[in-house]
Amino acid sequence: MSTPTGQPAYVLHSRAYRENSALVDFLTPQGRLRAVLRSAKGKAGSLARPFVPLEVEFRGRGELKNVGRMESAGVATWMTGEALFSGMYLNELLIRLLPAEDPHPAVFEHYAATLLALALGRPLEPLLRSFEWRLLDDLGYGFAMDADINGEPLAVDGMYRLQVDAGLERVYLLQPGLFQGAELLAMSDADWSVPGALSAAKRLMRQALAVHLGGRPLVSRELFRKP
């Protein structure tokens, strides 16, 4: 029998589970894993918090694992204010969208890089839009940002609407919720200096995410609205 080996992980969420235990959702290169952490009030429990790089040994073959060993694998990412809210938003997105035990190593790497950028005080909106887009793309929900659903290049002066899971459709009559071609092309190039590109990207990602999140709102979004 092979001995379980540790793998890099971050805690996405933790809650009390039975006596002195916690039920923890982890993000790993092998996907989102849920595991029971025994003696959660001890040393291991102090590590089981978000934004701490960990090495975790998981035991068990079922969907609910057990934490065999958990150690710090680096310095915790320290965030406050809107950067902290942003990190909580990323965690909630991953819990809601990432299937259990579905490997997405690129998502793990981008998550770790985004946490570091948030801690360094980088502008929040470009980081969040990039994470949302790359998460959708990695899960198979992405679409072209430089061409419409017919494969035609986007026109700078064109107007488009999102057909979720299909792509961008050009329209010729004004209606609510449209996107300008210039804004979309700027998003494709991550050129946030173009006027309106960031606000349009936020609208576009909300539309793209909504169908996959279902009707239940994201709790972390409410944090940004509080005074």
Curated annotation (Swiss-Prot):
Entry-linked Pfam families: RecO_C, RecO_N
A GO CC annotation given for this chain: bacterial nucleoid
InterPro entries per record: ARFGAP/RecO, DNA_rep/recomb_RecO_N, NA-bd_OB-fold, RecO, RecO_C
Domain of life: Bacteria
Keywords: DNA damage, DNA recombination, DNA repair
GO biological process terms, semicolon-separated: DNA recombination; double-strand break repair
Membership in a protein family: Belongs to the RecO family.
Family annotation (HAMAP family): RecO (MF_00201)
Function of the protein: Involved in DNA repair and RecF pathway recombination.
Protein name: DNA repair protein RecO
